[in-house]
């Protein structure tokens, strides 16, 4: 038996880090990715397409998204589509899952108990749903397979052994431990929630098929799962991402003018595509007229978007602080106050001094990066 598994597409996600136009483009790209997944399911002649939750955003989905999903999955018939709602697309009153009149080839699991769906070749799919956005318990607690054959789990949850390897801030929804899968009688579990792919002995996280934020790098895709007669599985990961999100660090040390910084950014991003976040670091010469928004606006055509942020970025000191501290001027008083402050670290002290002095000198452009 062959399945194509994916999860965590997050249709209609806001992409808060992106500008409105680019966020709109990224949301459209997620639809293209789902269409790519569906074509792959047909090309590989799988027995079913499975999704383990977070297919869309419950708080943001539109009627257009509902019709798109209905028609996209209906077009796959008679290929079966199995959906196990997660915490972002939980099943309940007002959910897209309840509003859509699905075609006969689509099955939506709708309870927090693992429910059997008999399949072909002696295989049973056991699926469950989140029915609230939070506080969903462990699906495997008190669950035990009660029949013969091959048994595959399909649900959205947090395998506790891998939680620390995921991006910080990931909430442990429906937490469980990997050894519970085998002890419950399941041969394997096809999962969702973790955006970083995991190939466990008895479980598979496909990862999100298209990056939603920076840091979600590497190959993004769906997983072709072959189930053998003894319940063992083989996996093939297939890239389906429409877009990419790249993180780049650029050292600006020694750059003496704005265009020199632009040139370094251009070199660092020349071979990249999609969205790129550039982190500037190093020591910037004090006379560089650098505006982050101007750099972002000059993004080359081969990039979808360019975001600039500061990392460990400092300004080369060009002021004689000892001499300035002796002045009976506003500048002198400012320098004395900052040097005598006990609440600042040395790095903070340098930033405050350079920023303040440049502002007093009417060189206010640097306020953007400090």
Task: Give the predicted meaning of each segment.
Residues 1-22, 220, 226-248:
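Domain-start "cap" segments at the beginnings of catalytic or binding domains
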Residues 1-68, 350, 354-370:
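N-terminal active-site segment of His-dependent metallophosphoesterases
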Residues 5, 51, 83, 153, ...:
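Structural beta-sheet core signal
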């Amino acid at each position: 038996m062959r399945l194509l598994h994916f999860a965590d597409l997050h249709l209609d996600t806001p992409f808060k880090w992106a500008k409105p136009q680019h966020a709109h483009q990224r949301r459209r790209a997620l639809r293209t990715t789902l269409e790519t997944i569906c074509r792959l399911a047909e090309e590989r002649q799988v027995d079913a397409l499975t999704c383990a939750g977070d297919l869309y955003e419950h708080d943001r989905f539109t009627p257009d998204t509902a019709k798109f999903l209905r028609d996209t999955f209906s077009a796959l018939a008679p290929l079966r589509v199995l959906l196990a709602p997660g915490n972002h697309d939980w099943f309940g009153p007002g959910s897209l899952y309840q509003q859509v009149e699905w075609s006969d080839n689509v099955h939506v699991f709708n309870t927090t108990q693992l429910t059997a769906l008999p399949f072909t070749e002696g295989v049973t799919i056991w699926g469950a749903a989140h029915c609230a956005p939070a506080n969903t318990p462990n699906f495997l607690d008190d669950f035990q397979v009660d029949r013969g054959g091959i048994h595959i789990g399909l649900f959205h949850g947090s395998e506790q052994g891998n939680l620390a390897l995921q991006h910080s801030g990931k909430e442990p929804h429906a937490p469980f431990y990997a050894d519970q899968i085998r002890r419950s009688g399941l041969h394997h579990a096809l999962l969702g929630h973790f955006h970083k792919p995991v190939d466990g002995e008895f479980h598979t996280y496909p990862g999100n098929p298209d990056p939603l934020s920076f840091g979600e790098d590497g190959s993004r895709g769906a997983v072709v799962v072959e189930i053998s007669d003894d319940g063992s599985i083989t996996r093939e990961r297939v890239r389906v991402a429409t877009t990419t999100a790249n993180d780049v660090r650029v050292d600006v040390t020694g750059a003496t003018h704005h265009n020199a910084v632009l040139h370094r950014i251009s070199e660092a991003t020349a071979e990249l595509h999609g969205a790129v976040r550039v982190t500037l670091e190093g020591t910037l010469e004090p006379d560089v007229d650098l505006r982050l928004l101007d750099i972002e606006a000059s993004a080359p055509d081969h990039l979808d978007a360019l975001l600039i942020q500061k990392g460990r970025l400092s300004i080369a000191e060009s002021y004689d602080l000892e001499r300035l501290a002796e002045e009976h001027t506003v500048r002198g008083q400012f320098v004395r106050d900052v040097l005598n402050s006990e609440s600042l670290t040395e790095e903070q002290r340098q930033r405050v001094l350079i920023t303040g002095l440049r502002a007093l000198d009417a060189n206010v452009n640097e306020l953007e990066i400090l």
